[in-house]
């Protein structure tokens, strides 16, 4: 500073080579190792291509779902059922068990902290499937809301839905309920928002503790570690959720899932919601039940 005479020092990194005339034998060849995430992406080109095809197919089917429903009849529901079953099965087998590409609330918490404190692209690019999945989820949430991911593409949600449908086909349909009794449903549906808010608050105290508490999601037990590799508390919790899925449609998704609660926030700003038809009355029951 010319006025005060104080000095300010700045540190920075920059490559520097001496001129070749000062080096015996010329400048040496330096092979720089490529970033780890680049190596991972290159090594899984085929799976990435298949995953992108799956995402494209899912987006196309969901965009055309109204046309598929119109082509279906009460006796022939193949047009609306088969694409949905295909996405459920591939979500469980290919995306969940094979690619291990299971979006989780921990990734949402990491995203929050990265925005507030330090953003590192390498962290998000380290898993190509999770990275691509989240780009697709964010875009689809603002187009159609969380319904596409939660209802058609989530590996655990698909597993829970298939368990419910298979149980119905095996003769348990008369014992099944779409929802808990209405007075219970109206209260319990808010629990997942409390779980999400609690995990987000805890993460600012201790991210490690938040990650442990986030195992309220059974995703890790189901796909990443395997239920046979967990201790009895995890096995018990997982088994209770599975048993509940036999009799109630997606109980975890409706009442406990913090990821669904997190996605509900941007879903408020979706471009396309439930469509009203000329036959619609003023009851708005569909918006309350599915919106």
Predicted regions span which residues?
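Non-ligating segments of multi-cofactor redox enzymes
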Residues: 1-289
């Amino acid at each position: 500073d010319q006025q005060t005479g104080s000095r300010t020092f700045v540190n920075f990194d920059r490559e520097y080579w001496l001129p070749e005339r000062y080096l015996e034998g010329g400048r040496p060849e330096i092979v720089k190792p490529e970033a780890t995430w680049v190596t991972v992406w290159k090594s899984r080109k085929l799976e990435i291509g298949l995953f992108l095809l799956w995402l494209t197919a899912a987006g196309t089917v969901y965009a055309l779902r109204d046309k598929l429903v119109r082509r279906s009849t009460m006796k022939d529901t193949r047009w609306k059922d088969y694409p949905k079953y295909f996405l459920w099965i591939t979500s469980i087998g290919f995306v969940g068990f094979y690619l291990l590409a299971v979006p989780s609330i921990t990734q949402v918490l990491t995203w929050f902290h990265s925005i507030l404190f330090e953003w590192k692209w390498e962290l998000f690019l380290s898993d190509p499937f999770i990275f691509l999945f989240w780009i697709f989820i964010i875009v689809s949430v603002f187009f159609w809301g969380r319904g596409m991911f939660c209802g058609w593409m989530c590996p655990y949600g698909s597993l829970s839905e298939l368990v419910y449908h298979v149980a119905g086909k095996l003769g348990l349909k008369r014992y099944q309920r779409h929802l808990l009794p209405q007075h219970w449903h109206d209260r319990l549906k808010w629990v997942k928002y409390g779980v999400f808010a609690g995990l987000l608050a805890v993460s600012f105290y201790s991210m490690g503790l938040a990650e442990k508490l986030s195992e309220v999601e059974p995703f890790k037990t189901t796909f990443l570690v395997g239920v046979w590799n967990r201790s009895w508390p995890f096995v018990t919790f997982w088994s209770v959720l599975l048993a509940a899925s036999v009799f109630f449609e997606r109980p975890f998704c409706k009442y406990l899932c913090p990821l669904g609660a997190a996605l509900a926030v941007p879903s408020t700003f979706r471009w396309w919601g439930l469509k009203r038809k000329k036959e619609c009355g003023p009851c708005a029951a569909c918006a309350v039940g599915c919106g």
